[in-house]
Amino acid sequence: MQHLKELTEKARNALDALDQGLDALEEFRVEYFGKKGHFTALMQELRNVSAEERPAIGAKINEAKQAILDILNAKKEAWEQEALNAKLAAESIDVSLPGRKTELGGLHPVSITIERVVKFFSELGFTVASGPEIETDYYNFDALNIPAHHPARADHDTFWFDAQRLLRTQTSGVQIRTMENMQPPIRIVAPGRVYRNDYDQTHTPMFHQIELLYVDKKANFTELKGLIHDFLKAFFEEDLQVRFRPSFFPFTEPSAEVDVMRQNGKWLEVLGCGMVHPNVLRNVGIDPEEYSGFAVGMGVERLTMLRYNVTDLRSFFENDLRFLKQFK
């Protein structure tokens, strides 16, 4: 116990003698409380004390140790505050200067395109519709006049869960569900994710589509052409040369693919369209003798690539901030 008293007194005197300096405090802590410190060695000597005396002596050592630590911590806190005050006093702060700019995120280029397309058609009276991404073969194929032998049903194109369920390959199922639950006139725009088993520079297994459906008593191809002309001019913000090429889609008749002339003089396909096939109208209980309709389907990534001159579709899904920051 005499040794403990002497050690405590020595530690107090050493602390009092320290000049201001955090490094000196750390050296003191290591000397007295480190692995080979004086108080650590004193605690290890308890093994030589009888079991009856050990608790009382151990308590006294801990009490003395804590008293020194309290002084050490108080001195450290005071010196740290003094150092901070000195640093602040030496710094010149102009409170009239603007604060640091907060780094803000931005919309993904695909989201920007979806918003632009939806905004255009919403202003024309179209409402946004959506549907499930896990679809049945009826809504993805049968109701759209796609026969069982159609190549789109093959495993190399479609992700099947079982014989009836799949990841939708197109957003056209939204059109069927809408026509089942609404009476004409119908005007919808349906953006969403779709899935096809393909991956290269111009294809990814997941991508985005936007489909347009208009059903009314006097819907016709002339209206469809005018609508597409106006949309492409607004989307690309230039008076583009547009052409319609005859094509085939099981769910529209007649059908067309739409190309635009780019600055390099080449035609580029941007979307597909056509008049809703009478069989599709019959499948949802709409009389094709009374009503007609037209549909438009476009790939969002393709539109985005053309608008921003992106050459690799996969860039949209690699989360490279150097690429994405260009669209803020």
UniProtKB/Swiss-Prot annotation:
Cofactor(s) it depends on: Mg(2+)
One GO cellular component, as annotated: cytoplasm
Chief place of localization: cytoplasm
Enzyme class per UniProt: ligase
Record keyword RNA-binding present: no
SUPFAM superfamilies according to UniProt: Class II aaRS and biotin synthetases, tRNA-binding arm
Keywords: Aminoacyl-tRNA synthetase, ATP-binding, Cytoplasm, Ligase, Magnesium, Metal-binding, Nucleotide-binding, Protein biosynthesis
Catalytic reaction annotation: tRNA(Phe) + L-phenylalanine + ATP = L-phenylalanyl-tRNA(Phe) + AMP + diphosphate + H(+)
InterPro entries: aa-tRNA-synth_II, aa-tRNA-synth_II/BPL/LPL, Phe-tRNA-synth_IIc_asu, Phe-tRNA_ligase_II_N, Phe_tRNA_ligase_alpha1_bac, Phenylalanyl-tRNA_Synthase, tRNA-bd_arm
GO biological process, one term: phenylalanyl-tRNA aminoacylation
Leader sequence residues: none
Cofactor note: Binds 2 magnesium ions per tetramer.
GO molecular function terms listed in the Swiss-Prot or TrEMBL record: ATP binding; magnesium ion binding; phenylalanine-tRNA ligase activity; tRNA binding
Annotated localization: Cytoplasm
Disulfide bond entries: none
Binding site residues for Mg(2+): 253
Pfam families xref list: Phe_tRNA-synt_N (PF02912), tRNA-synt_2d (PF01409)
The keyword Oxidoreductase is assigned to this record: no
EC nos: 6.1.1.20
Assembly notes: Tetramer of two alpha and two beta subunits.
HAMAP family: Phe_tRNA_synth_alpha1
Similarity remark: Belongs to the class-II aminoacyl-tRNA synthetase family. Phe-tRNA synthetase alpha subunit type 1 subfamily.
Protein's name according to its UniProt entry: Phenylalanine--tRNA ligase alpha subunit
Organism: Actinobacillus pleuropneumoniae serotype 5b (strain L20)
